[in-house]
Amino acid sequence: MDKKLLAILACPVCKGDLKYDREKQELVCKNDGMAFPIRDGIPVMLEKEARTLTTDERLG
């Protein structure tokens, strides 16, 4: 994930910061407890495509 791109992207729901999860290829918003997938190097910033974080993921 390009650091410049990550710096300008925000959660489409709450406009909060996103963290890059390299292992899962996701952009994570801990505020909303959502993880947005990265497919073929492109972040999919659609709420309906996001998965809900587990309790452990939210706390960790």
Curated annotation (Swiss-Prot):
This is UPF0434 protein HCH_02705. Transmembrane segments: none annotated. GO terms for cellular component: cytosol. Signal peptide: none annotated. It comes from Hahella chejuensis (strain KCTC 2396). InterPro entries: Trm112-like. PANTHER family: PROTEIN PREY, MITOCHONDRIAL (PTHR33505:SF4), ZGC:162634 (PTHR33505). Belongs to the UPF0434 family. HAMAP family: UPF0434.
